[in-house]
Every structure is written in C-alpha cells, then in structure tokens.
Amino acid sequence: MIALLIIDMQKGMFTKETPRYKSDLVNNNINSIADIIRSINGRVIFIQHDGNKEEGYLPNTEEWELIPEIRKNNQDRIIHKTACDSFYKSELEKYLTENAINELVITGCATDYCVDTTIKSATSKDYLVIVPNDGHTTTNRPSISAEQVIDHYNWIWSNLILPKKNIKVLSTNVLIDYLGKKEK
C-alpha cells in the first residue's frame, strides 16, 4: 500500500521572516497528490513537529498548527515528531507496519532538514520512496538560494547509491499519472 507523508506544513514554518520558495505551487501539488492517494485508498499522513520553548512549535500554539492551505480529511492521520527524522521516536513506523504500507510519497518543508532526513531514513528501512520534485520547499540559506537547495536535493535523491533503486524523483504531473495507473 502507498502513503503520502506531508511533513511540517505548519504555520510557524511559513512566516514573513521565512518565506518558502513557491509555497503556493507546493501547496497545490500536495493537495493534488493527496486527492489521488485518497482515491486509490492510500493513506495521507500529516507529520507535525512538536517543539519546545527553545525551538518553538510548542503543541497547541498557533505556530504549531497545520497550515489551512493543505486540505485535511477526517480519515487522514496526524503523527507527531520531535526530530528532523519523522521516524525517530514517533508512531510512524508502527502505523506504516500496521497498515501494510511499503511505498511512501514524501512531501513538505523544509527540503534540507526534515524532508531530506525522513527520505534517507525511509530508504534505510527499505521503503520504496517517491519524491515529487515540486512537492517540497525551503527558504533561502546564508550561502545558497532556496531554488538551488531544492534542485540540489532533487539531484542527490536521484543519485543516491542504494542496494535497491528505491527513490524516484518525479514531477507532480508524472506522479499523478503513475498513481492513476494504480487506480485501474
């Protein structure tokens, strides 16, 4: 079975101080992917970072809340995490195992932190991983633009040396076509 992970799409990640690259496009792409995943009886999982007083994102604060631009359905699952790796000391792997999920579409924020760490963790656990190259975002960094960060990580994920070829980096349109074939 397939699942969509939507990582850290929280209000505190999307502020005037931390504008995210092409966030409207990324939000629309995530919504489109979520719609088709639901239509083929896959699972949609929101990964929500639970922070602390020092780093922010305290549970039940406004910055911790999921952004309203990403549509959430009642059957979607929220899994809480406290580290960049969505698997680390969370209920994610247990939920995936209980639901016989072996294929993950990974999206969200930030490309160079939680998205990258979760992708690499998932591959080390032998999940088949698909990354929509236009389904994750970040902000400008001190020595590199957000666009360059995203391009760089899309290239890295496409070229990782793994025992299995288990990362596919595709555009949202190609991914939707691929998922549509699973529906038939």
Language-model features: where?
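Active-site-adjacent betaalpha module
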Residues: 3, 32, 57-184
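Short acidic, Gly/Ser-rich segments with clustered Asp/Glu that frequently serve as metal-coordination loops
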Residues: 12-16
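Phosphate-coordination/substrate-recognition cap region in phosphate-metabolizing enzymes
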Residues: 54
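Short, well-ordered beta-to-alpha junction loops that form the rim of enzyme active sites
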Residues: 49-50, 109
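A short alpha/beta connector and helix-capping loop motif
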Residues: 18-46
